Amino acid sequence: ETSKICAPSVSLIDQPVKIVASRLGDRFRVAGTAELAGINTDIRQDRIKPLLKWVEKYFPNVSTETYTPWAGLRPMTPNMMPITRESKMKGVFYHAGHGHLGWTLSAQTAQIVANKISQ
């Protein structure tokens, strides 16, 4: 119960170390790793440890004794530039590859794709 009270109630971004934190229901979610791994959701412990240490440093009253690792697959390109073009199949367009910047870039790249469709 102490952990719930001591965890922040707003989303946080620690830009220098590339860690984000937010509430997810009654849980405290901390994320900060991404790698080009193909279709692979294996979670390496060496990627989890820095996240736990970050929580322990900035939120010492939040317990890290139990945690639930999770990995999601996000289409992304090596240079983080999304793919916004027509496929080989006429009338089918790509709008993917945004990686962790999906919500940030999606509206603008949707406009780019819409412009291509209307041409």
Regions found by a protein language model. Give the residues of each.
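Active-site substrate-recognition segment that forms the wall
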Residues: 1-90
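C-terminal lid/capping helical subdomain adjacent to the catalytic/cofactor pocket in oxidative enzymes
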Residues: 3, 81-119
